[in-house]
Amino acid sequence: MANPLYQKHIISINDLSREDLELVLATAAKLKANPQPELLKHKVIASCFFEASTRTRLSFETSMHRLGASVVGFSDSANTSLGKKGETLADTISVISTYVDAIVMRHPQEGAARLATEFSGGVPVLNAGDGANQHPTQTLLDLFTIQETQGRLENLNVAMVGDLKYGRTVHSLTQALAKFNGNRFYFIAPDALAMPQYILDMLDEKGIAWSLHSAIDDVMAEVDILYMTRVQKERLDPSEYANVKAQFVLRAADLEGARANMKVLHPLPRIDEITTDVDKTPHAWYFQQAGNGIFARQALLALVLNSELAL
């Protein structure tokens, strides 16, 4: 089938319409059920990680290999010309784009992925995270997991907990779920790490219900999805981190009274915001969520690199 994502840059979740999201999720489900090990057999994809990553990088590279693509790139920019010789990001991308069919990129600077599109010569750039800004492929696997566990992406009660200021995953996920009808949001965070005002303004403009809370217990009985996040030490000064890191911790005992099919999600890595006794409960779904990253990213790569896709 012809698809609207062919050769498209994927920088922000807002680059994707509701119909685009549904296409990616449907493709992910097909690839999960029916692997396609030669779909990208003659493609070369650059995996360029200017910032540390475990799950996102390995998930993306596994996705590439399982579709038959060749993979080039780096996991540490310190050993590149950009890191050692002071080459600009623009020049780095201009050169890499002459070698490959697509560029997957993570960078600590907000807006770096969007900047890269200006120098990629039309080669698609897929944002694997740019600072505290956007993480669209994490959002796709989150949506895929929510749809699998809840059977829908509409009329959901979704709580987001922890670092909502710097946590790019919650920004992207809120924007994505706002494209679907009837969803309600509960934001649970210390004042220093509250959801940015532009997200709240967006929800208000769309007439979407949201509320602020100071404790997980306030909403446990009402939610379908409890999306936990870690306090990101690397984005805070030491005194601020010490003050807020243990303020919101989920324990197995806290899950009493939760809806039977409520799922706890987390973009990982987990530090101490979810105790290990939660892992043994039927609500814990963060490891399955991480595994779904393979299928969501396979779907996106397949769509971006194939003008027509019949699965």
Curated annotation (Swiss-Prot):
GO BP field: 'de novo' pyrimidine nucleobase biosynthetic process; 'de novo' UMP biosynthetic process; amino acid metabolic process
Residues at which L-aspartate binds: K85, R168, R230
One GO cellular component term noted in the UniProt record for this chain: cytosol
Reaction it catalyzes: carbamoyl phosphate + L-aspartate = N-carbamoyl-L-aspartate + phosphate + H(+)
S-S bridge residues: none
Top EC category: transferase
Domain of life of the source: Bacteria
HAMAP family attached to this UniProt entry: Asp_carb_tr (MF_00001)
Family in the record: Belongs to the aspartate/ornithine carbamoyltransferase superfamily. ATCase family.
Role: Catalyzes the condensation of carbamoyl phosphate and aspartate to form carbamoyl aspartate and inorganic phosphate, the committed step in the de novo pyrimidine nucleotide biosynthesis pathway.
Protein's name in the database: Aspartate carbamoyltransferase catalytic subunit
UniProt source species: Klebsiella pneumoniae subsp. pneumoniae (strain ATCC 700721 / MGH 78578)
Upper taxonomic lineage: Bacteria, Pseudomonadati, Pseudomonadota, Gammaproteobacteria, Enterobacterales
